[in-house]
């Protein structure tokens, strides 16, 4: 595991959050459309199934991304166990796995934003040192 894996993890987590928003919007649209169509006579069956397929498609995309994230997080967490400074682990976990902004991480940890950025840089370096030692 190296910094690229941390970046990839953050990208996946942000993608999941974004996909969840799209899913919720689509689900609301499908629910509203289905309710509207249920008042109509014929041929709503096919439309209803098409709408269900659309919802299933978005749900499957999210589940696939979540599985990918889980595998990556498991590997990252095992490398975190090798790190001695809990501040570093917390910053990396909040930022890359929790998808928090630096401002949110700083607030959560009670640090200034600039100091949090400095610690994040050091934390990434420490994370990569353990990659070298463990492989």
What is the predicted function of each stretch?
Residues 83-100:
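Short amphipathic alpha helix immediately N-terminal
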Residues 116-127:
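DNA major-groove recognition helices of helix-turn-helix
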């Amino acid at each position: 595991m190296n910094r690229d894996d941390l970046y990839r993890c953050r990208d996946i987590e942000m993608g999941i959050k974004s996909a969840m928003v799209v899913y919720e919007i689509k689900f609301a649209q499908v629910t509203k459309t289905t309710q509207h169509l249920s008042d109509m006579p014929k041929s709503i069956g096919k439309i209803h199934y098409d709408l269900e397929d659309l919802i299933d498609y978005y749900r499957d995309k999210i589940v696939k991304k979540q599985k990918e994230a889980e595998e990556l997080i498991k590997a990252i967490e095992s490398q975190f166990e090798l790190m001695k400074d809990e501040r570093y682990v917390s910053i990396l976990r909040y930022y890359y796995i929790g998808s928090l902004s630096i401002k949110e991480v700083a607030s959560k940890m009670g640090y200034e934003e600039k100091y949090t950025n400095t610690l994040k840089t050091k934390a990434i370096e420490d994370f990569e040192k353990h990659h070298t030692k463990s492989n």
